[in-house]
C-alpha cells in the first residue's frame, strides 16, 4: 500500500484530497478508478481495521480493565484512535465562555475518519429535504432535486452494501429494485414496538444500515458501477470478495475486522490503492489551500505531525473533505490579497450558522419481557428497525413554531 512520507511526494498530482472519511474516500475511489493521479492528506495515523479492531477480544484482554486512555477515550474495546471532543496537541478556543453556548464536535484522527465509529444508519434524504423553502418557508431550496441524486444513491448503496426494505413511506425514499441487501430479523424489542406502533398509527420498519447482511454480488455489481472499464471492474470485484457477511456476534463499535460493516478504509481506499493511482500521506495536518496567479487552487500547505515541519503539495485541483468544521477552517485560513476573508467567503458567511442534529435517548422497563427464554439476538450491533420521519407538517400546523418531524431508532 503506497503510504508515503513527505520526501516521497510527487512534484504534481491531478487532485489533492484533504480527509479520508466518507467524502474523501468516495472521491479518491471514483477518481482513481478513472485513472486520475491522487494524493490524499490525512491528519491522523494509518489504521487497518482488519488487524487493529478488537472485535473478538474478551473483557479480560483489556489493559487497565478497559479504562480510557489519551489514545482511546472510550476505552480498549473501541476502534477509535486519537479521537474525542478534544485532541491532545490540538488546542482550540471557544467563542463563548458559557458552556451551554459552546459548540463541540467529535474529531477523529485516523485513516477512514469518522466512518470508523459511525453507527452506519444509511437513510436517504427525501424530496422535501432538498426543497425546505418551497415546502416550509425556511432556509433555501437546493439547486438540485432528489431525482437528480437518486441514481447516485443507488450506486453508493451497491458499493458499500446497505441492508433494508422498500416501504413506500412519505419522504423516506425507496432504493431501486435489487439494490438493498436483505434486512435482518427484528429483535424482540423491535417486534414489540412494531406491534404496538400499529395501534397508534406509527410505522416501525426495518432500518437501512451499511452492514453486509449477505455477501455482495461481485459478479454483476462491478459492471453496473464501472461499465466499459474492465480494470476497475476487476479491482472492485476483488475488493468485494474480501468482505464477509456479518455473523451477528460482536459490537460494531469495536471495529469490523471482517469488513462487513462499512468504513472508508475497507470499502473505498483499498480498491483505490489497488489502482496504483493513489498516494496517502498520513499525519499531515492541512493548513491552507494555495492559489496560482489566476486565483485557482494549486495545492495544499500542511504540517508534518512527525517533525512539525511545513510542507506543500501541488495539484491541479483540490478537494476539501475534512468534515464541515475542518473544511471551514481551511477555507478561512486560505487568505490572500484576492480573497482577504478566505476562500469562497465573499458573503462572509463561511463558518457561521452551522447546525448540529438534536437528539435524545430514553430507556424503559417492559414487564412483558420478563421470563423470556434466553436467546441470542445480538444482531448487527445497532438498530434493525426505526420509525421513519413522521409528523412532517403537523408541528407547524399545531403552532409549535417549527417545521420538520421526528425519527426514532430502537
Across the structure, where does each feature detected by a protein language model lie?
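Beta1/beta-strand and adjacent pyrophosphate-binding region of the FAD-binding site
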Residues: 7-23
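Residue-level detector of alpha-helix initiation sites
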Residues: 21-22, 26, 184, 325
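Gly/Ala-rich phosphate-binding loop of Rossmann-like dinucleotide-binding domains
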Residues: 28, 32
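Glycine-rich loop(s) and the adjacent beta-strand/alpha-helix scaffold that form part
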Residues: 33, 37-62, 258-262, 267, ...
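Conserved N-terminal glycine-rich FAD pyrophosphate-binding loop of Rossmann-like flavoproteins
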Residues: 45-71, 108-117
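Conserved redox-cofactor binding core of oxidoreductases
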Residues: 65, 71-88, 94-100, 104, ...
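FAD cofactor-binding and catalytic pocket of flavoenzymes
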Residues: 88-107, 111-114, 142-146, 347-410
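A conserved short coil-to-beta-strand element within the FAD-binding core of flavoproteins
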Residues: 209-210, 282-298
Amino acid at each position: 500500500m503506497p503510504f508515503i512520507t513527505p520526501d516521497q511526494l510527487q512534484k504534481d498530482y491531478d487532485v489533492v484530497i484533504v480527509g479520508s472519511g466518507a467524502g474523501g474516500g468516495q472521491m479518491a475511489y471514483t477518481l482513481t478508478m478513472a485513472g486520475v493521479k491522487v494524493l490524499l492528506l490525512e491528519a491522523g495515523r494509518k489504521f487497518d481495521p482488519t488487524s487493529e479492531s478488537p472485535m473478538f477480544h474478551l473483557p479480560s484482554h483489556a489493559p487497565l480493565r478497559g479504562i480510557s486512555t489519551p489514545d482511546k477515550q472510550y476505552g480498549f474495546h473501541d476502534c477509535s484512535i486519537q479521537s474525542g471532543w478534544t485532541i491532545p496537541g490540538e488546542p482550540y478556543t471557544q467563542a463563548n465562555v458559557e458552556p451551554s453556548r459552546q459548540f463541540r464536535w467529535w474529531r477523529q484522527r485516523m485513516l477512514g475518519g469518522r466512518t470508523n465509529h459511525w453507527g452506519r444508519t444509511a437513510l436517504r434524504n427525501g424530496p422535501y429535504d432538498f426543497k425546505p423553502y418551497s415546502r416550509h418557508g425556511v432556509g433555501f431550496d437546493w439547486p438540485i432535486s432528489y431525482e437528480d441524486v437518486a441514481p447516485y444513491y443507488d450506486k453508493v448503496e451497491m458499493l458499500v452494501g446497505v441492508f433494508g426494505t422498500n416501504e413506500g413511506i412519505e419522504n423516506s425514499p425507496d432504493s431501486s429494485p435489487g439494490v438493498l441487501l436483505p434486512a435482518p430479523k427484528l429483535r424482540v424489542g423491535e417486534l414489540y414496538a412494531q406491534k404496538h406502533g400499529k395501534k397508534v398509527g406509527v410505522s416501525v420498519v426495518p432500518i437501512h444500515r451499511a452492514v453486509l447482511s449477505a455477501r455482495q454480488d461481485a459478479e454483476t455489481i462491478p459492471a453496473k458501477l464501472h461499465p466499459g472499464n474492465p480494470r476497475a471492474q476487476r479491482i472492485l470485484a476483488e475488493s468485494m470478495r474480501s468482505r464477509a457477511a456479518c455473523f451477528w456476534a460482536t459490537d460494531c463499535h469495536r471495529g469490523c475486522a471482517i469488513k462487513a460493516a462499512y468504513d472508508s478504509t475497507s470499502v473505498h481506499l483499498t480498491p483505490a490503492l489497488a489502482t496504483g493511482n493513489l498516494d496517502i500521506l498520513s499525519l499531515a495536518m492541512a493548513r491552507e489551500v494555495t492559489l496560482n496567479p489566476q486565483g485557482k487552487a494549486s495545492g495544499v500547505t500542511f504540517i508534518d505531525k512527525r517533525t512539525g515541519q511545513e510542507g506543500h503539495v501541488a495539484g491541479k485541483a483540490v478537494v476539501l473533505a475534512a468534515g464541515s468544521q475542518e473544511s471551514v477552517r481551511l477555507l478561512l485560513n486560505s487568505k490572500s490579497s484576492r480573497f482577504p476573508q478566505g476562500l469562497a467567503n465573499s458573503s462572509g458567511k463561511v463558518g457561521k450558522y452551522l447546525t448540529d442534529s438534536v437528539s435524545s435517548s430514553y430507556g424503559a422497563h417492559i414487564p412483558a419481557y420478563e421470563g423470556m427464554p434466553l436467546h441470542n439476538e445480538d444482531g448487527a450491533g445497532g438498530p434493525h428497525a426505526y420509525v421513519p420521519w413522521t409528523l412532517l407538517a403537523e408541528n407547524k400546523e399545531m403552532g409549535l413554531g417549527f417545521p420538520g418531524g421526528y425519527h426514532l431508532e430502537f
